[in-house]
Design a protein with these regions (language model features):
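Gly/Pro-rich cap/lid or specificity-loop segments adjacent to the active site
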Residues: 1-67, 74, 78-91, 95-99, ...
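Alpha/beta-hydrolase-fold enzymes
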Residues: 79-81, 85-168
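Active-site nucleophile elbow and catalytic-triad environment of alpha/beta-hydrolase enzymes
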Residues: 164-165, 180-201
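Long, compositionally biased charged/polar accessory segments in the mid-to-C-terminal portions
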Residues: 174-176
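Short, conserved loop/helix-junction motifs that constitute active-site signature segments
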Residues: 202-206, 231-232
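Short beta-strand/loop motif that positions the catalytic acidic residue
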Residues: 205, 211-213, 217
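Conserved alpha/beta-hydrolase "acid-adjacent" motif
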Residues: 218-224
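Catalytic histidine-centered segment of alpha/beta-hydrolase-like enzymes
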Residues: 238, 243-254
Length: 255
């Protein structure tokens, strides 16, 4: 059977900022504790034990999910037979952290973020989504995907697309979860407080591993996946050749 679990801090059912703080009887909102990728991996291990699963056939993780999958495999070696890591890294880059901080700045610049309501920070979250899209795609992606729209609607096609994506996200994600999840991504470092270098951290992974990178990914450059594959003892490396950047793993399903 297949299990797709919500991550700690998310807004899809697992404990997160809209959950009730037992000490106050009210939702956490911006007071929700800072969490790390390792916290998320520990939460998945608790779920595994609750479901009485002794061994996992395959763990699949992409982007932040790939970060969690690595930590899970390092913290609990022998947990899974196989590991598939897609468009991810072993330590979150300064480039990625800068993108995440820019998004958080946009959210916190929205005065409603400090009001601690379900809709708090919604306008800022729309801007954050627009910033994020620029890192998920690239110049060629926009040039190709907006070409036909631009012929029909004029030069505002790309601008309208950014607005649309921002409006769509706020219908399913709250700003407080977005902030905490992005902070967790920034914390990712398989070497932190456990080894001298990242290669040594990755060497602890015992599972058969397939690492997949996207040729045009500017957020998680393909060199980051190659580094992972080179450092895990039983790893193979593959690529998705696409102009869709980081989002290619969601789009290029045939590959």
């Amino acid at each position: 059977f297949i299990i797709c679990a919500n991550n700690l801090g998310s807004c899809y059912g697992t404990t997160g900022p809209l959950s009730i703080n037992p000490e106050t009887g009210k939702a956490w909102f911006s007071d929700f504790p800072t969490i790390t990728i390792r916290d998320m991996a520990n939460a998945l291990e608790l779920l595994k034990k609750e479901l009485k699963i002794e061994k996992i056939h395959t763990v699949i993780g992409s982007s932040q999910g790939g970060q969690i999958a690595q930590e899970w495999a390092i913290m609990f070696p022998g947990n899974t037979n196989n590991l598939i890591l897609i468009a991810t890294n072993c330590v979150h880059s300064s480039w990625g952290i800068a993108f995440n901080e820019s998004q958080r700045m946009a959210i916190k610049a929205d005065p409603s973020y400090g009001e601690n309501t379900d809709e708090g920070g919604a306008a800022g979250l729309q801007v954050a989504r627009s910033i994020a899209l620029l890192s998920y795609r690239n110049y060629a992606t926009y040039d190709v995907s907006q070409r036909e729209r631009r012929k029909k609607t004029g030069y505002k096609a790309a601008a309208d697309y950014q607005q649309y994506q921002g409006e769509k996200l706020v219908k399913r994600v709250n700003a407080y979860s977005y902030v905490r999840l992005s902070e967790a991504m920034d914390s990712h470092d398989v070497c932190r407080n456990r080894c001298k270098n990242h290669e040594a951290g990755l060497h602890k992974i015992k599972a058969n591993t397939l690492v997949i990178g996207v040729t045009s990914d500017i957020l998680f450059p393909i060199e980051e996946q190659q580094r992972i594959a080179d450092s895990i003892p039983k790893a193979n490396f593959a690529t998705i050749d696409s102009l869709y950047g980081h989002d290619a793993f969601l789009i290029e399903t045939e590959q």
